[in-house]
């Protein structure tokens, strides 16, 4: 069983990369792309102090309307609106198959969804990590390159954040996600490595920094610029996609059209949407999204925070609404999904008595890296009244979901077993 302390499942090379970048940044040796280093220091200072959760900003009546800044409709039976974001209701996934339909896929925006015409779109690859000058790729040119498809989940690093407070009584900052800030799709596109090689990436390249076309982010009066986050060149040349299709259709605007990054198993912020340019650098790069944001701060972590977050953690969710009602003395089929950024899911256990007894669930899918598995189990409740359902996954690395997750002030990487309330009548 896990100790409950968040640990990275990243390979040694990923971990050493992150820690090296952290030391370089702290000593002023890494270039902060697009923001003054003093402002980055302010972000780190702010991140070390917990702030209240940002609650859901809409009643069901409001949620039925379109959210400003989001293109697709957000009916309340499918989504819960949380600030400028939309969380998928897990109960809406019960009969959808392995892949999450685009109309049920969660939306995480830092600003408003830009609507970009693919015919006018150009991807510019530039920087001193190239052997030559900048290289442009049109949408048609990108689609003409060898294509690959990959099934992968995209999950916000803060998915499950609300349970730090509701289950563990701890204060954290950020959007109060439950477990619906995740979706799995079949992505089609071109390998980022293919584009970088055609652009002339040099052997001296160190970092690759994709940047989105959404509006600049302003936080507490500081302009952080457009969303961007560097990847180590080794990762950029590995399994990363520049995706232009989602579940066999062109990307919808809210999910990155015309082209987005897919970084399998990594935290959602690495999967930059609406990519407009990619900087290839011969020196380390940093941005607000891997210094003051998307790191672990709080008791047990260095003052400057943990290494930047990379791989996602292990979670399970029931395909049920909170407080779902069940008839006593009847057989019910409980369904859910489990996933891990570290290794494929090996097994799932379910408890219907608050954790006293556990039994194995039936896995419905072949477990694969970077995807989730569906599972089910039968339940015949005997006693009426309130109850709690629990699901606990174990992945092939041997890691299981713990009873609690070590606190961090921004509420990232919650991996503890979630208590799902139900009522038996």
Predicted features along the sequence, with ranges:
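Structured, non-membrane catalytic/scaffold regions adjacent to prosthetic-group chemistry
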Residues: 64-425
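C-terminal region of N-terminal signal peptides and the immediate post-cleavage residues
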Residues: 54-66
């Amino acid at each position: 069983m896990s100790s409950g302390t968040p640990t990275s499942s990243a390979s040694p090379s990923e971990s050493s990369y992150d820690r090296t970048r952290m030391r370089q940044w702290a000593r002023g040796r890494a270039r902060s792309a697009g923001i003054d280093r003093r402002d980055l220091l302010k972000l780190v200072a702010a991140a070390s102090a917990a702030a209240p959760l940002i609650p859901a900003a809409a009643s069901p009546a409001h949620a039925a309307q379109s959210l400003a800044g989001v293109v697709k409709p957000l009916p309340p039976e499918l989504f819960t609106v949380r600030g400028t974001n939309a969380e998928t209701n897990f109960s809406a996934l019960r009969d959808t198959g392995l892949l999450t339909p685009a109309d049920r896929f969660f939306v995480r925006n830092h600003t408003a969804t830009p609507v970009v015409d693919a015919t006018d779109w150009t991807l510019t690859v530039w920087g001193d990590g190239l052997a030559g000058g900048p290289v442009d790729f049109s949408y048609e040119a990108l689609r003409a390159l060898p294509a690959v498809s990959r099934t992968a989940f995209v999950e916000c690093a803060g998915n499950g954040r609300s349970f730090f407070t509701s289950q563990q009584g701890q204060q954290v900052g950020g959007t109060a996600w439950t477990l619906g800030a995740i979706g799995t799709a079949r992505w089609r596109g071109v390998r980022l490595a293919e584009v970088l090689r055609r652009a002339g990436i040099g052997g001296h390249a160190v970092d690759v920094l994709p940047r989105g076309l959404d509006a600049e982010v302003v936080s507490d009066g500081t302009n952080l610029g457009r969303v961007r986050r560097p990847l180590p060149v080794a990762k950029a040349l590995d399994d990363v996609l520049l995706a232009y299709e989602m579940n066999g259709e062109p990307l919808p605007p809210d999910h990155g059209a015309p082209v987005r990054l897919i970084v399998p198993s990594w935290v959602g912020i690495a999967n930059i949407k609406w990519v407009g340019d990619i900087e290839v650098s011969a020196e380390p790069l940093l941005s607000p999204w891997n210094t003051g944001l998307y790191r672990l701060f709080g008791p047990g972590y260095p003052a400057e925070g943990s290494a930047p977050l990379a791989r996602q953690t292990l979670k399970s969710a029931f395909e049920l609404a909170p407080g779902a009602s069940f008839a006593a003395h009847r057989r019910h089929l409980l369904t859910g999904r489990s996933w891990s950024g570290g290794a494929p899911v090996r097994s799932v256990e379910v408890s219907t008595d608050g954790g006293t007894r556990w039994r194995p669930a039936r896995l419905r899918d072949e477990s694969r890296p970077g995807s989730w598995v569906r599972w089910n189990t039968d339940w015949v409740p005997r006693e009426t009244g309130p109850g709690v359902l629990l699901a606990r996954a174990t992945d092939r690395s041997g890691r299981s979901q713990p009873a609690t997750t070590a606190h961090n002030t921004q509420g990232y990487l919650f991996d503890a077993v979630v208590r799902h309330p139900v009522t038996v009548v």
